[in-house]
A protein has these predicted regions:
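Pocket-edge structural micro-motifs
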Residues: 42, 62-63
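N-terminal domain-onset segments
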Residues: 1-46, 55-56, 71-235
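Primarily extracytoplasmic ectodomains and periplasmic/lumenal surface modules that are beta-strand-rich
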Residues: 58-60
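Short, solvent-exposed aromatic-acidic interface loops
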Residues: 63-71
Length: 235
């Protein structure tokens, strides 16, 4: 498992890969998102979660809910913050104020945060306070998907999102500029554009030129919005 710093970088890289993916598949725009320093994910199959980072304090708090987990049956009597019982107080506070705020749901008429697995960091090290297999069964599998080396993560998203060479190059460039706090110009990532591209050689009825839409307008908007959540602007 990587440390806090690498996990944060991996979440950023994953989100940039996601932004390029929704350029062509805008329906999945909600599968990854950022709100401040809170990274949220949703697999649309019953598992969702949020990782809240406090980089200045070198801590994070992560909470996940799997609808398939037996832990769900403990609610509403059980309180999600109890998953952080052995965490330091500053981590508990981060979990309560941030991560768990994204997991509100209703159980037997009671609306409260519902989580089935949790993890945190102490001194930058990621801590999982239960058996690894139980943690995965309770919704924690995604942490192991993104908690790998940069090269492994890059290969994972290339395959998962079926990114071609141009798309992957755009992901890498945006990520490198984000890390370096450098500007990104539209000509640096020509694949990200909303206008229709005409192909003169293709003709439809009555000899009219057919239009090929390179990127759907909503896909472009979702891509730009996803990047914007990280403060990334294409000039």
């Amino acid at each position: 498992m990587v440390d806090l710093s690498q996990l944060y970088d991996n979440c950023v890289y994953s989100s940039i890969a996601h932004a390029l993916f929704v350029l062509k598949e805008p329906f999945f725009s909600a599968s990854q998102s950022w709100d401040g320093m809170n990274y949220s994910f949703n697999d649309f199959s019953g598992t969702r979660g949020t990782i809240s980072f406090d980089l200045s304090g070198n801590i994070l708090a992560g909470a996940v809910r799997s609808d398939e987990s037996e832990q769900c049956n403990l609610y509403p009597e059980f309180k999600a913050i109890e998953l952080f019982a052995n965490a330091p107080e500053n981590v508990k506070l981060l979990a309560q104020k941030e991560a768990l705020e994204y997991l509100y749901d209703e159980a037997d008429g009671v609306t409260q945060p519902i989580a089935t697995a949790a993890f945190w960091s102490v001194g930058g090290e990621i801590v999982i306070d239960e058996d690894i297999e139980e943690f995965k069964a309770n919704g924690g599998e995604y942490l192991f998907t993104i908690g790998v080396s940069h090269e492994e993560l890059r290969d994972y998203w290339r395959g998962e999102y079926d990114l071609n060479n141009e798309e992957l190059a755009a992901v890498d460039l945006i990520y490198e500029r984000f890390k370096a706090r450098g500007a990104i110009r539209s000509e640096d990532v020509p694949i990200i554009k909303s206008k229709e591209v005409q192909e003169p050689k293709k003709r439809g009825l009555f000899g009219r030129k057919q239009k090929t839409v390179e990127q759907e307008p909503d896909g472009y908007a979702e891509c730009i919005a996803s990047l914007g959540e990280l403060g990334i602007v294409i000039e």
